[in-house]
Amino acid sequence: MSENSTASHAAAMAAFKSLANNNTSSSSIPSSYKIPTSAESAKIRSPTPLNSNAAVPQNRPKRAATSVGVKSTTKPMAKSIATPISVKPSKANGFVSGVNKQRAPLPLARADSSLKSSRRYPQSKGLQASSSSSTMPKDMINSVKQSIESKSVGKDPSQKRISSLYEPQEMLKNLRSSISAKTVSGTSVRPMISEKNQAMINGIRDRIDSKRIVTDVSKTSSLSSEDVSHLQGHDLANTHTYQPLNNNDSFSSFGSSFSEVEPSSLSKANGEEDEESIIDNASATVQEHPPVNEEVAKNMNMDKTPKAKPKRRPPPDLVSGPREETSIPMFHDKSVESLPDGYSSTDADITLENDRNSSQSKFPQFPDIKKHKKTEKKGNFLKKYSRPLKCVDNEVNLLDSDEAEEEDETDSSYGKRAPQILTPPTQQVRLKSTMRKTNRRKEKKYMFNENKPWKNHNELSSISEQERKRYEGLWASNKGNYMNSVVTRLVGVDYDSGKSEPEVEEEEDSRKAARLSSKAGTFDSGKMSDQENFHGLLSVEVDQLIHGVVVRRIWKRSRLPRETLEAIWNLVDFRKDGTLNKPEFVVGMWLVDQCLYGRKLPKKVENEVWDSLGSIGLNVVVRKKGKR
């Protein structure tokens, strides 16, 4: 045992010395420490995991007997030098990943670690090619610097947008020097004009030149020297004297307005320009204008004021006829250049004088609105298919505007219509008493309901047949009670019916006339007699009366206040003897029921209530059909 341990220790020391010497060649390195090839290095760098399903490589390089993962054939050293480590084997896919390992000696372990750190595996051919093709970091830094320098602004101050002198004093000095240089040279810095801008300026110049020449030479050649001198001597500043001549309020259909000659509508500046243009055109030569300055051409659109568009002329059929007799109308805001041929500037004074003499002259209108009115057709359609309105004359069209009325007043010599006169309405105006329509359902709905009498007020001033029969039954059961015990004399009762009639003495005519005159009243005697007979004031039987005591006991059952019952008694008591006859008792009972319904007592019982009792005393039996 001791010999084997010494032999292994000697072998380990020899290996350690060989590793310590770096000058040894590759041939002196044992076969277990040879550098693997590229294929083997790739396998070593990317080992398969233990838990993966990949197969275990068969050509795995074998290490020396002293490596940790392989069991050494030699016997272990003493316990103080190396102690065995027991590791439980773990099987994964049939591969034993753990074996009994022995701890190597300390110098041998250090030599093995230094060897692993100094070991460099060569790269494959593909990796060497890629690394050789890529640039070094210095080259990359140089390329970045070159790109930055190419994009940077040069040192020339003309290329820089911001001055390098940021101090205010130096900036002011540079500004003053530049201003002084410009003033000395006398030239202003103008921006460079591109071809497109130059073409636009040339187009503006051409348009201005074309607008200055409006009329042909042939039109203005008819002007004589006298006309030109008259135009030069004409003063447009004193045109305010002709302002009241504008009395025409008519308008044409296409927006332009005819009016008499109104020099006041032309400004002085426009008039001067027109005179100059006429004089220039009279010379029959077109003057060439000098080139326009660039700044003037730029500001031409800003200074140009909007002018009125040239308006349409009237058609030739209306102008060609009475052209020589009538004055030529002028449009508002219109220059002399747009006037027709053969017109001279002296015609304006002639027309002004004629207008002073005849202020009623009116100009013809175009088109004739009276002949082409669409509202008339619409009016005829309404007349045919619509009802005529009351209090409105159907011949008058209410849809015409105020302008049409003004046009009728300002009719020309071409045609005049007689003024239309409003005719009075043929039928008398009848107003409806109400706009509501009668509905039978509503009438049936609002009929009197005895269970809800407060909802209807129909027939409140009359006693119904049903109510009258009920009150008469109550009177029949209580009439004549306690009448034999009455001590006072009753009105209309004949107490002397059993005694002999007194003899009638003859009276003189004078006494008889005096007695009749004293009894004569303001009321009609027939009317008074009917009322007396109705209330039983002249003649009545005792059995047909009801005592006041009985009436009080009956009315008290209604539980109305005593004052209300007293007011009802006063309304129906015409006898003034403490009794009531049949009509008075029935009306009193009806008033009690009305108070129970919530109606207020009237100040006087109306005659309609008394008239509703006209059939009292008639016993008529009404039989229905089919019954015998």
From Swiss-Prot:
Residues 400-411 have a biased composition (Acidic residues). It holds the Pfam family EH. Belongs to the IRS4 family. It comes from Scheffersomyces stipitis (strain ATCC 58785 / CBS 6054 / NBRC 10063 / NRRL Y-11545) (Yeast). It comes from the Eukaryota. Residues 21-83, 107-138, 253-276, 297-380, 398-421, 497-527 are annotated as: Disordered. GO terms for biological process: endocytosis; lipid metabolic process. Keywords: Lipid metabolism. The gene is IRS4. Residues 527-616 form the EH domain. This is Increased rDNA silencing protein 4. The lineage of its organism: Eukaryota, Fungi, Dikarya, Ascomycota, Saccharomycotina. SUPFAM superfamilies: EF-hand (SSF47473). Positive regulator of phosphatidylinositol 4,5-bisphosphate turnover and negatively regulates signaling through the cell integrity pathway. Involved in rDNA silencing. Residues 21-38, 253-267 have a biased composition (Low complexity). Residues 370-380 have a biased composition (Basic residues). The keyword Disulfide bond does not apply. Residues 322-336 have a biased composition (Basic and acidic residues). PANTHER family: EH DOMAIN (PTHR11216), GH06923P (PTHR11216:SF174). One of its GO terms (cellular component) is cytoplasm.
